Amino acid sequence: MTVPRVRSYVPGLDEILFGGIPERSVVLLSGGPGTGKSILGKQFLYNGLKRGDAGVFVALEEHPVAVRRSFRHFGWDIAQYEREGKFAIVDAFTGGVGTAAQRERYIVKQVDDVHELSDVLRQAIRDTGARRVVIDSVSTLYLTKPAVARGTIMTLKRVIAGLGCTAFFVSQVSVGERGFGGPGVEHAVDGIIRLDLDEFDGRLYRSIIVWKMRDTKHSMVRHPMEIKDGGIEIMWDKYIKITGSSVRIEPLPKEEAEAMRKAVEDVEKQPAPKKIEIEEE
């Protein structure tokens, strides 16, 4: 059975996912500060916009003005898509306070009320016809109330998947923490992608690993990655080998690299996806 997929078009990411993200999945982007989680989420949205997939960005930790500026930093012009009604920012940061915030169309007044957030998000998705959603950072919603984490994630997931969207939830973890955002969160999402920034012999190494992804095969090794002027690039045909306190970047076995490359080619040959059936009411 062929699994419908959403291509990220992030260099190297579709390869390590053997073709892309299964449609309607909610994927946790987990990692410490400075690892590139927010960049990856925005790159996923912008790559979709360029190819006709409308998108919604939920800002929980940044002012909408700062969000737009961070897109522009990489040359990602979202202004035209906002004007055309194909992209929207849900302001769950300001609570509607301030003159700049008052110009926003989608505002969550009670930023810790997940039901209000769900209602505003639902409206933004319907208005734009969004296929892609990014929430940055979902950790903000339950940081002081870990007991409600799973319920929060499931509430948002029902709205997003029910409206036919595929989503990235950015999740903050402390430096050196091995988890991904808590057991309630980790089991509720469909996929987990971990981004890391580690020091070896005085040098920082960026890496990415797919920890889980339902309905698809995925790479089982840690891949090196870089943040360049145009966004994130993953060295999908290489992996990081750690021995003691040293690190080496090695090429993947040829058969593994070939299988990843072929999987992406096969997805590219598939016919354009049909209109997604909306189930959520």
UniProtKB/Swiss-Prot annotation:
TM region(s), chain numbering: none
Annotated source species: Pyrobaculum aerophilum (strain ATCC 51768 / DSM 7523 / JCM 9630 / CIP 104966 / NBRC 100827 / IM2)
Family statement: Belongs to the UPF0273 family.
One Pfam family hit: ATPase
Residue positions binding ATP: G31, G32, P33, G34, T35, G36, K37, S38
Stored InterPro entries: KaiC-like_dom, KaiC_dom, P-loop_NTPase, UPF0273_KaiC-like
GO molecular function, one term: ATP binding
PROSITE patterns: KAIC
Claim: Nucleotide-binding is one of the keywords in the record: yes
Source organism, top-level taxon: Archaea
Keyword presence, Nucleotide-binding: yes
Alphabetical UniProt keywords: ATP-binding, Nucleotide-binding
Name this polypeptide is given: UPF0273 protein PAE3143
Annotated ranges, domain KaiC: 4-248
